[in-house]
Amino acid sequence: MVGAFIMQGSEKMYRFNIKEISKEDALRMIRKYHYSNTLPKINKYFLGFFLDKELVGVVTLGWGTRPRHTIQRIFASLDTKDYLEIGRMCMTEEMPRNSESQMLSQLVKWIHRNIPELKILFTWADGMVGKVGYVYQASNFIYAGYSDGEMYMKDGVKIHVRQMKSFLVPGGQKDSRITVRPTIEQMKKYGILHFKGKQYRLYTGIQIITFWKKRSRCSEFIAVYTGFWCKSYLCGRWD
């Protein structure tokens, strides 16, 4: 089935045809419908969501700039092979407002069928641009704290601090620093804006797995099952 929908109450329930697409096709959609206009550097899957052969949504899966650090902040026993991160997700503007939640639900099922060894699907909600992860909350993702962050923007395009070298270090000149932050004078010269804020961690589970997370005087038991979470607290709380 290429694509279909059924009615449930007053809302359409879409059945997407999900298949891998080229990086170029994904990037065209992202540039048109995603606020960042860019792709993360480490991408493993470019997934297209089709209705009647029309590409209406895109999700990229891969890892961020510090893959191992990211997952081990939540689960110390896991590694990069155990999770994938949603790098970009977007849909055409014609799709109804509940469509992204349906897309996420069907994405989890696609992962369960095609990457059965995966344990965690992870994402960030970019609070610095007013994103607090409503679509992920509606899709049963679990909030896992936040990270203080910063970003730069030039000509309306978000620039990660690790990309600053391309603007500030002359071509051919070696610089051993991982990040290079611009001075006030350089920001004025190149028209770069600087923002500080929070990025929110959210995740959902793909497999049945059990973790013990040690706290000062208590432990927490968390069971994960195909996108639905059951949490049983022995004491303490998850934050």
Question: Which positions does each model-derived feature cover?
Answer:
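A short catalytic or substrate-binding loop motif that flags glycine-/basic-rich loops and adjacent residues
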Residues: 39-43, 194-197
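Acyl-donor binding region in acyl/amide transferases
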Residues: 20, 62-192
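Conserved beta-hairpin
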Residues: 30, 44-63
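C-terminal catalytic/acceptor-binding lobe
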Residues: 187, 191-201, 206
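Low-complexity basic/metal-binding stretches
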Residues: 200-203, 211-221, 225-239
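Short amphipathic alpha-helix that is part of the acyltransferase structural core
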Residues: 5-41
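Extracellular structured ligand-interaction cores
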Residues: 44-46, 138, 199-201
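Acidic, Ala/Val/Gly-enriched low-complexity intrinsically disordered segments
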Residues: 2-4, 223
